[in-house]
Amino acid sequence: MAINIRKTHPLLKIINHTLIDLPAPSNISLWWNFGSLLGLCLIIQILTGLFLAMHYTADISMAFSSVVHICRDVNYGWLIRNIHANGASLFFICIYLHIARGLYYGSYLYKETWNIGVILLFLLMATAFVGYVLPWGQMSFWGATVITNLLSAFPYVGNTLVQWIWGGFSVDNATLTRFFAFHFLLPFLILALTIIHLLFLHETGSNNPLGINSDMDKISFHPYMSYKDILGFFAMIFFLAVLTLFIPNLLGDAENFIPANPLVTPPHIKPEWYLLFAYAIFRSIPNKLGGVLALLFSILILMLVPLLQTSKQRSTIFRPMTQILFWFLVANSIILTWIGGQPVEQPFIMVGQIASISYFSMFLIIIPFASWCENKILSLN
């Protein structure tokens, strides 16, 4: 009998166990496509970023001009830049949908995979933030100033920490240079953690919509799931192409078309749309340190989700109370995103505070209590 090289070769064997002969549950839906879409996003971002870095100059006197040069003079530079900028938005859309699927179907009970995923989200947010500073427009400069200033809220070490990150007494050339270094380095760290994320996932196997053990009903990843993923790739590339070619500045900020000016403050300083929900939570707390802790906890709370599981069922597919609350949480997050983009005035302050309280209450009290109630109702029958 002929030896199959993909099953015996040391290198091909790893690829085979990851992408070809991997046993996958037969009933996983399109919601399981977002993991592979995130991988595609990461590849697109690294490749476009590499080409942009070849033409970009990390100097405050030339950064803005170098971005203009990329868009005007470099062959297809405008396309590469637009793909990179909108690819970041698509990356966040995919990761938020990926997290939502994990919450809905109980995938968070794979604790190692879930916690590495939360760390990946943190790294992605950090990468996006430092990347947003690089064009050195008005919102880049003032966004960097405001967000890095948050560290001054920490007692004793705060001011020293801020000056250490700035590399001086204000956001200046040293800040831009180090942010460029971080923006170049972090995607490779994300890539390494993604491999560890997959490693832990393949220890347990994928979850499925029913949230039950599917060992008796598995199919090979290729061709069934691989073709399903390729369909997702085409859909996402089409969406990215429409965004990039027809409405490239839809998700950006008009202020960033103005070169950075430390003497003129924009009327409303805000980060990109994908960080607005956390920014809204930060702004809803009157105390600076409290706001910073709330900002961090808005993401870190995801790590508590496996510990707060009170339901006897894994997936919410047979739990109508939790399903309704899940969609309340989704709506709440959308409201927070909207509030983060609004000026600090009534009624937005009040709405933001109510949405922030309900965001944390959902995770810590309401959903665990609803799950406990569902257990009681089930035990009555």
Curated annotation (Swiss-Prot):
Predominant subcellular localization, coarse grouping: mitochondrion
Cofactor binding summary note: Binds 2 heme b groups non-covalently.
Co-factor requirement: heme b
Residues reported to bind heme b b562: H84, H183
Binding partners and assembly: The cytochrome bc1 complex contains 3 respiratory subunits (MT-CYB, CYC1 and UQCRFS1), 2 core proteins (UQCRC1 and UQCRC2) and probably 6 low-molecular weight proteins.
Similarity remark: Belongs to the cytochrome b family.
Protein name: Cytochrome b
